[in-house]
Amino acid sequence: EGVVLDLLAHAHRRAHVDHDHERAMVALVRAMEACAQRQLFKQYKIKTWDVQPEQLPDAMRDTCRTCYLDDVDGKYKLPLQSQFRVLAGLGDQMGQAFLRDWPKMKPLFDAANHAVLGHGFEAIKAERVQQLSDVVMKLTGVSESSLPKFPNLNL
């Protein structure tokens, strides 16, 4: 949970202090992934970077075997959206919430992917960062007041 809080706090600093929307967006996406990874490992002992297909819900096993095999190290690796699909398939509330909210989130993830720090050349708008931040905070159950803050030094 500490990593998720740190990533969310980092995203908020990038957005509100530095006005660096690209880095804020990257940190928000990573916070979501870290949250899914934590839940998968803590609750189900699933490592997203070394998945055993037998650990997954039946409906996802064939997809894992055909789509997620790393040809270099021979390990199955789940991408972000699939991590939440697995959680949902296992009956996890966070995974189910992700799937329910996916239609609202997809344009935000697309914006992150089309940004320079993603895979494209488009600028990130501040409102997109705020929208994704709102979604991530809701999905993770984190309140802004629980985010770590740096102390103010009066020098």
Report each predicted region and the residues it spans:
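Amphipathic alpha-helical interface elements
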Residues: 2-86, 151-152
